[in-house]
Amino acid sequence: ETRYAFEKAGAKVDAVHINILLANKKLLEDYQILALPGGFTYGDDISAGKILANQIKYNLEEDITTFIHEKKLILGICNGFQTLTKAGLLPAIDKQHQEATLTFNDSNKFEDRWVYLKICSNKSVFIKEENVPTIYLPIAHGEGKFVTKDETTLNKIMSNQQVVFKYINECGEEAGYPWNPGGSIQNIAGICDPTGQILGIMPHPERHVEPTQHPRWTRNGLKEFGDGFLIFRNAVDYVKSNL
């Protein structure tokens, strides 16, 4: 689905296994976007995304740093978001340490439903200049509660405009469960790094790129694209214009 979304936006996509990348780190030089899709890497053993995060942190840290310095993009969806936080790539205020995590849902169960999101900041390259107040995406996770290590980190994320998405209800108001399915602090659903080049999001934009993927499309009528498509379109447009 992630591959399809990027291809629909005009990108040429290769699916590269982490072991291949670890064996040939120079592969990163051939690409402009690194996407970590949703799923259950390593069976979510230890904690969701932690093993992949360690592989990235201890084997690819310099390569990822170069990737970002070259103005390239990284997207983490669900398990990919969990991986980016545990690798210290998000929120990346103090680049030497992990500052946030995605932990077990307050409900202590797997949550699978559609949620409303509001776009809080256009700091992220993936959201630049979008004038869309609300988007509707599916979620599917057991460890989707976003928390920071302390209040200072949270305040910095907020003041830096790194909070890109928040959970809201159908009236556009921030609300608790079930609209905020994991119990994330401040209803945070997605954040970016200080450069805006790295985006992590718990809901699944790749599962709503076609209008017919909306659960009420027969009643609401068809739009040109599904709500999640803007993330992939903006990323590809950025690459075409800047890299």
Positions of PLM-derived features:
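Single, functionally critical "micro-switch" positions that shape active/binding sites
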Residues: I77, A140, P203
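Catalytic beta-strand/loop cores that center a nucleophilic Ser/Cys/Thr
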Residues: K118-T195
